[in-house]
């Protein structure tokens, strides 16, 4: 067994620097002068096992082979590991004799990942040659947010510059860019039409208040009611007879007394409560006819 391991160890030594030749002349010269560490027990065992597994699975990656070899090494017992441990000790003793001044110096990492490179998307997910297009796309999309809702893009632009992720070129289409803009003209509510009709109806009722305030200034709440119902100036109502004015004034007092607590007026509230519900509907009819001027000719 030891003879087999010695042949496996001695034979691949000239092939150890083949991978470094492709790195360049300077790297190859440095690798030849560099003294390698002695192999441990796992490396002695995995050298032959790795070759077998690579022949059985030619498409398997080297990292996957290393994972499987590590799992298999843990499953071995101490008796099975003993010959490889002894061989590792022998190689270490030979290494110390050949290189007495050897000191382990780990290699420095040549490339240090920046924060921007660490959180950026990998280039394999994008189409080749799309990096040059992505910069223009990201700048164009950041400009879409500049005057949105009337606010300038001061702090948000800085954040976008720091977090400028590469995006797909299809995001530059005009349909998608229009989605980032708000159209304030389309935010008109349909409730405005109903509000205008409500205000127009209120103006017809408020047009009667000047005529009533000229007749009687002692009516309760007429001043406040006229101030609440102030709207657009409307055309003055036609002349109304004294009979219709008294009827409308009485109905108007009944409507006001409906919302007042009992005891505030000298009138009989028990009689008013019975006539309130009956007088509300004729009030609108008489008010509408008085304002629109559709009274019979006999009353004029």
From Swiss-Prot:
Chain residues forming the annotated DNA-binding region: 35-103
InterPro entries, per database record: HMG_box_dom, HMG_box_dom_sf, SOX_fam, SRY-related_HMG-box_TF-like
One GO MF term attached to the UniProt entry: RNA polymerase II cis-regulatory region sequence-specific DNA binding
Gene name per UniProt: sox3
Predominant place of localization: nucleus
Keywords: Activator, Developmental protein, DNA-binding, Nucleus, Phosphoprotein, Transcription, Transcription regulation
Domain commentary: The 9aaTAD motif is a transactivation domain present in a large number of yeast and animal transcription factors.
Biological function: Transcriptional activator.
Protein name as it appears in the record: Transcription factor Sox-3
Biased composition (Polar residues): 13-30
Native organism: Danio rerio
Lineage of origin: Eukaryota, Metazoa, Chordata, Craniata, Vertebrata
Phosphoserine PTM positions: 235
